[in-house]
A protein has these predicted regions:
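Boundary at the C-terminal end of the N-terminal hydrophobic targeting segment
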Residues: 25-29
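Bacterial N-terminal signal peptides that target proteins for export
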Residues: 3-13
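Bacterial N-terminal signal peptides
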Residues: 14-23
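Histidine-centered divalent metal-coordination motifs
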Residues: 223, 262, 270
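Catalytic phosphate/nucleotide-handling subdomain of diverse soluble enzymes
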Residues: 275-277
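Hydrophobic alpha-helical bundle signature of multipass membrane enzymes
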Residues: 31-259, 280-286, 290, 299-302
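Extracytoplasmic/periplasmic copper-protein system
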Residues: 294
Length: 304
């Protein structure tokens, strides 16, 4: 009877979490005003955090599961990258509990993702796969590379709702600042992932069907972390658009959950750490000088 009661409570909580994301809204800068892509309520993170994240007895093998170092893609190249601005050790960031693989919280997260997988439309899947390719590659620094300009254009995708003036060709100072900031955030993202070595959701729950396995650990989400960092920078340049920009970053985060490649807790940690990361940047004198130059550029280029 006790087990049945627990299952019922888990079912009800899972249902509440699913209902919290079954809203439809217009995304910031969503091309063609497409309103058919569900947007999440951030309250589903709060609900999941209420669930016990500690390991359950008798699951030592499951809890020992880590992302294998041998499966890391390009790790040697990643480790060679040095930061432009960021200097804080990752231990300076807020402690965030990574739920154990066997925990009730991880089970609730996996159930949530299975329900997303069951209910996602072909249109939503196509949208997720599209924006999965919109990221900045810090190793693509050769201007003769055919994808060099596209790589830098990707830095501007999150803020596309600011208007047509917000573009690489129009904002060289902004392009340089964002490329350096996201470069730094990628360096930190790798360090976080190596430290926690969290296995991907599909490694714990084989019913999650993915397009292809990814070459690094789950925690935190790189797409989410970089998007929230980008949003935090832009929100300091356009504070009146902060809510829109954070919603745009949330699109990236939720798309990773919808694809089954990241836990919600990966996304939430990314949001928290991104805010701290940007706060730390403002302690760097060179960053502040470069940021002030970008503010002047915006004052000249942004329509009044």
């Amino acid at each position: 009877m006790k087990n049945e009661t627990y299952k019922f409570k888990r079912y009800i909580l899972g249902l509440l979490i699913i209902l919290s994301v079954m809203t439809v809204s217009k995304a910031f800068g969503n091309e063609n005003g497409n309103t058919n892509i569900r947007q999440p309520e951030t309250s589903h993170y709060e609900k999941l955090l209420q669930i016990d994240g500690k390991p359950q007895p008798g699951n030592e093998t499951l809890d020992a599961l880590k992302f294998p170092l041998s499966e890391w893609g390009g790790l040697y190249s990643w480790k060679l990258l040095k930061t432009y601005y960021a200097t804080k050790p990752i231990d300076a960031f807020q402690k965030y509990e990574v739920p154990a693989n066997s925990s009730k919280r991880t089970r609730a997260e996996l159930d949530y993702m299975l329900e997303l997988q069951r209910t996602r439309s072909a249109e939503e899947l196509a949208w997720c796969l599209k924006i999965a390719d919109i990221y900045y590659d810090p190793m693509n620094i050769n201007p003769t590379n055919p994808k060099y300009n596209q790589n830098r254009d990707n830095l501007f995708y999150l803020g596309r709702g600011l208007g047509s003036w917000y573009a690489r060709e129009n904002l060289p100072q902004t392009t340089e600042l964002l490329s350096r900031v996201v470069h730094d955030s990628m360096v930190y993202m790798v360090e976080f992932k190596l430290k926690y070595a969290r296995p991907r959701p599909y490694a714990v729950e084989p019913r999650l069907k993915i397009e292809k396995p990814l070459p690094h650990g789950s925690f935190p989400s790189g797409h989410s972390f970089n998007s929230y960092v980008n949003a935090e920078i832009l929100a300091r340049l356009a504070p009146e658009r902060r809510a829109d920009l954070m919603n745009a970053a949330q699109e990236f985060a939720w798309s990773r959950e919808l694809l089954g490649v990241h836990y919600p807790s990966d996304s939430e940690a990314s949001r928290i750490w991104a805010a701290q990361f940007v706060k730390f940047l403002f302690e760097n004198k060179q960053f502040v000088r470069d940021f002030e130059a970008v503010k002047k550029e915006w004052a000249q280029k942004r329509p009044k």
